[in-house]
Amino acid sequence: MPVQSRRRTPTQAQVGPAARAAAAVPATPVPPAPPAPAGRSAAGKPRRRRDPLWARLALVVGATLMVTSGVAIVGSEALISQATGSIEQTDLLGIAGKSDAEGGKDLTGPIDMLLLGVDARARWDVNDTRADTIIILHVPATHDQAYLVSIPRDTEVQVPAFAKNGYPGGTAKATEAFFHGAQNGGGWAGGAQLMAQTIKNLTGISFDGAAIIDFNGFKGVIDELGSIPMCVKQEVESHHMSRVNGKVMWNADAKKTGQPRQPVVHKKGCRDMKGWEALDYSRQRYGLKNGDYDRQQNQQQLIKAMAKKAMADGAMTNPLKLKGLMEAAGKAFVLDTGKTPLADFIFTMRGVAANDLVLLRTNGGTFSGNESGREVLNPLSQSMFAAVKSDRMAEFILENPSVIAASK
């Protein structure tokens, strides 16, 4: 079934229980309750989900939103082993990881992860890679909600010096921080570490973990699911792919054939998409009214659709389906869970369902550039980052509902 296009108000379905309680008093909203221990409400009662579903971190929320249930936790050791065994883990945060004083030693408080989407095509050198998608995933200390905040790729940032490969630092677009960190042997790990430092300096947020998501690898995950429901809000011609004799291929490869090429056009409407189509659509920014902001929203839609499909298909409770999904995910991700084992992430975030994922936007979803043609984040966006850092997102959204990205 296609993703519904109805937008829900933030005082109802798109904020957590604490925020909904606050919204019930029209005159003076009550602030969210103090953070409760993981997996329990502020009243001390175990949290019960509307749709308890198993397996929450094979795509690491946002790129990983498959949720665990208390029922299926029994005997789940083998499932967790598959998840951890299929996904490469390495240090992606460097000095941008949370210190013990910031709560980095465990997951009892709020959880912040940096998700980086890269386009690593086989013909490209490993060092010639930029992070075109930059997302902060925030889970409040109540562990009953997840927020995705996309940072525009063209945001002007101060990239710090990186001693590991001799990069001296400088002013650049956010997407270029990954490229500079990957040079001179830095590789993807170096790219992620320099990006994490850059985003920490920009937002003030330290991270519990990070993931590099190869969008080409995502194709295998979607194909393992069969297809995912996506909605095209605005017709757009692909800037990356063409058809030659009915076969879809990269534009560069299509040109080499010497044959007539037909453009791939993503028509308006909702439908099930195969991996190549969903990924190609989520990559587009040229030809869209709001450029990179529309692309951010489409990529957030992709992530949420993958999570919902995985849960709806029962992939999380079927060992054979899960094995195939984990193997495909292992080709799409590099992961860093900091000082905490991946299994702990899975169990800590088992109370978050796909419908609890809130998609947020910076700068009101419109480009705001400077004389250099780079994006500059406005004061409201900076306040949103401050709300993430102080774990006040539910209250912030009640006060600023315009930051919620419209559902498709």
PLM feature spans:
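Non-catalytic, solvent-exposed segments at the cell envelope interface
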Residues: 2-64, 68-408
